[in-house]
Curated annotation (Swiss-Prot):
It is found in: Nucleus. One of its GO terms (cellular component) is nucleoplasm. InterPro entries: Myc_target_1 (IPR029180). This is Myc target protein 1. May regulate certain MYC target genes, MYC seems to be a direct upstream transcriptional activator. Does not seem to significantly affect growth cell capacity. Overexpression seems to mediate many of the known phenotypic features associated with MYC, including promotion of apoptosis, alteration of morphology, enhancement of anchorage-independent growth, tumorigenic conversion, promotion of genomic instability, and inhibition of hematopoietic differentiation. A motif (Bipartite nuclear localization signal) lies at residues 95-113. Belongs to the MYCT1 family. It comes from the Eukaryota. Keywords: Nucleus, Phosphoprotein. It comes from Homo sapiens (Human). Down-regulated in gastric cancer tissues.
Amino acid sequence: MRTQVYEGLCKNYFSLAVLQRDRIKLLFFDILVFLSVFLLFLLFLVDIMANNTTSLGSPWPENFWEDLIMSFTVSMAIGLVLGGFIWAVFICLSRRRRASAPISQWSSSRRSRSSYTHGLNRTGFYRHSGCERRSNLSLASLTFQRQASLEQANSFPRKSSFRASTFHPFLQCPPLPVETESQLVTLPSSNISPTISTSHSLSRPDYWSSNSLRVGLSTPPPPAYESIIKAFPDS
């Protein structure tokens, strides 16, 4: 789109320049014709004054009007011939310039366009690099804050839980019956839910929450090893 606009502007500029050149040529041609006629007329008057054969009865010399008409026609003819010759020379020069102008104009327009697009690309590169630098700085600050928060959280003494350190795919299982000497006792499920929530909270820490709430939660110890053995008796 920009290239089309630039081409249209260049065409309009060159068309206006050609019209202005034509007007200047016409004005120059008219000036040359007028000067040639005026100079020839002055030469004729000087000739008449040099060969002055006036008589006392008439203020004008003999055959004055005939000589004036003749000089005017001759001066006009000479002026037209000179003007036509000069016009033909100017047309030939303008055609040669037009034949050689598009290459230089096209190359100059291409150079200016390439320099302009190169400048735009460089400005875009600087903008993108500035954005990337800002994003990198923001990411670095976020990671630094996260590391600092993790270090603060780890600085407090905390018990390491068995369920948080190992992977348990079957956590949400129904309570298991335990055989005792007199009756069957089911393991309470209240100990499982906080361990699940705490394990999830430890596996996915919320960086945007306050550190005091996360540190204050303490995980209960796992069930006794003997109860697990009794829950799965040997068959």
